[in-house]
Amino acid sequence: MAVRAQFENSNEVGVFSTLTNSYALVAVGASENFYSVFEAELQDVIPICRTTIAGTRIIGRLTAGNRKGLLVPTTTSDQELQHLRNSLPDDVRIQRIEERLSALGNVIVCNDHTALIHPDLERETEEIIADVLGVEVFRQTIADNVLVGSYMALSNQGGLVHPKTSIQDQDELSSLLQVPLVAGSVNRGSNVIGGGMVVNDWMAVTGLDTTAPELSVIESVFRLGEGAAPGQINSSLKDTMVESFY
């Protein structure tokens, strides 16, 4: 299921929200409509937490997370951290990171198995990412951009990358991540994929300007049209994991 939404007249959905397979974060704000888009799809499935990070609403650009964990910048207040701990499932690890490149959502893109990170992140940060999120970590660029989190959206099913990513780079990234990748855009031609959409294994939210062709590319690469629902995804994933293991 791919749906379109706006946060207070902004199409940059990925700036104001974070979506994983075990929780969603949505910025505090007057945009009740934006929150209700998440609520309609996720209400009985995973918790949706309304929050600020470091007193700001650009939570999608400041945080990075997956099913197992959530990374927040060191500027996150104690109250915000406590609110996240109270709202998210107990088995999700929440960790503050002391990192110069503190917009973590711009410099990290991950699913439940792999993370791509900005080439200049601290070695210590890389270790924390691997530990808290339980992923393999690779230092990469996307179409020669170091902001991997801004120019890519990734789930366990597939990934959408910057439209100028070469075929060779797509193949290399695809073999690292072990998921199919497509070069494309969101919000009527925007190449800032990470800022323009959020996705998990059964749902994507994109900006209201996203065109029908863009939406169909998103639905096909992330496999969202195949009767996707949380329960079915897990069983099909388990089957493929078992097959690839043997």
Swiss-Prot record:
Record GO biological process: assembly of large subunit precursor of preribosome; cytosolic ribosome assembly; maturation of 5.8S rRNA; maturation of 5.8S rRNA from tricistronic rRNA transcript (SSU-rRNA, 5.8S rRNA, LSU-rRNA); maturation of LSU-rRNA; maturation of LSU-rRNA from tricistronic rRNA transcript (SSU-rRNA, 5.8S rRNA, LSU-rRNA); ribosomal subunit export from nucleus
How is the polypeptide modified once translated? Phosphorylation at Ser-174 and Ser-175 promotes nuclear export.
Question: What are the alphabetically sorted keywords of the record?
Answer: Cytoplasm, Initiation factor, Nucleus, Phosphoprotein, Protein biosynthesis, Ribosome biogenesis
SMART domains registered for this protein in UniProt:
eIF6
Localization per record: Cytoplasm; Nucleus, Nucleolus
- One GO molecular-function annotation for this sequence? ribosomal large subunit binding
Q: What is its main location?
A: cytoplasm
Q: What is stated as this protein's family in its record?
A: Belongs to the eIF-6 family.
**Subunit description:** Monomer. Associates with the 60S ribosomal subunit.
Q: What does this protein do?
A: Binds to the 60S ribosomal subunit and prevents its association with the 40S ribosomal subunit to form the 80S initiation complex in the cytoplasm. Is also involved in ribosome biogenesis. Associates with pre-60S subunits in the nucleus and is involved in its nuclear export.
Q: What is the name of this protein?
A: Eukaryotic translation initiation factor 6
> Native species of this protein?
Neurospora crassa (strain ATCC 24698 / 74-OR23-1A / CBS 708.71 / DSM 1257 / FGSC 987)
Instruction: Report the gene name.
Output: tif-6
